[in-house]
Amino acid sequence: MTERSLNNLILASSSKRRIALLKQINIEPGLILPADIDEAPLKKELPKDYSIRMAKSKAEKIQSLNPNYFVLGVDTVVACGRRILLKAENVEQAEKCIRLLSGRRHRVYTSVCLLTPDQSKQHIRTVVTIVKFKRLSEQEIKYYLASEEWKNRAGGCNIQGLAGVFVLFLRGSYSSVIGLPLHETYCLLSNYFNFNLY
């Protein structure tokens, strides 16, 4: 298979966390273009299905405007049972999410979709990670909400920040919880691109 330059790759996301994770494994996409799509879940849509649909929709939206590029779409979803916890739009929503997750296990689904030029091939991988938070005190909830670290985070969770001390255990991929499963992403991209880890 012909190996290509990373200049031919578009990341369909403006997430600083995902950009940093890609740089961690020496991947710098040629372009970074966020996709403007409708992110509302469908009625009775399961978290995994939603994550896959969002990653695919982001990649397809960007590739429709850039058909000659490879496009990487990614989506991370926090779920408590079958309930999808979206990004909190205000502190009240963030508080509901944090109280729901307090003392409970939840799942983080991150889907990665790689489209080859003209959508000739489509590769999708989904990683599921189980996380359990300690039971939070009222003071901990208050401090976390005041920090505003919940902003622009799936389920209002930022385990790279203050919420990291809430984690009793994590089973799965830490990088996936942050926003990009590095192992799966590396395996997908290494089939097409020439880059070195070292």
Curated annotation (Swiss-Prot):
List the cofactors: a divalent metal cation
Q: GO cellular component terms?
A: cytoplasm
What keywords are assigned to this protein?
A: Cytoplasm, Hydrolase, Nucleotide metabolism
Q: Which Gene3D superfamilies match?
A: 3.90.950.10
According to its UniProt record, this protein's enzyme class is hydrolase
The keyword Mitochondrion belongs to this UniProt entry's keyword annotation:
no
Pfam families assigned to the protein according to its UniProt record, in alphabetical order: Maf (PF02545)
| Signal peptide start-end | none
Catalytic residues as annotated in Swiss-Prot or TrEMBL? 75 (proton acceptor)
Q: What is its main location?
A: cytoplasm
Family classification: Belongs to the Maf family. YhdE subfamily.
The compartments listed are: Cytoplasm
Which Gene Ontology terms cover its molecular function? Answer: dTTP diphosphatase activity; UTP diphosphatase activity
Q: What is its EC number?
A: 3.6.1.9
Function, as annotated: Nucleoside triphosphate pyrophosphatase that hydrolyzes dTTP and UTP. May have a dual role in cell division arrest and in preventing the incorporation of modified nucleotides into cellular nucleic acids.
What catalytic reaction does the record list?
dTTP + H2O = dTMP + diphosphate + H(+); UTP + H2O = UMP + diphosphate + H(+)
What is the name of this protein? dTTP/UTP pyrophosphatase
Picking any one GO biological process from the record gives: nucleotide metabolic process
Site feature: Important for substrate specificity: 17, 76, 160
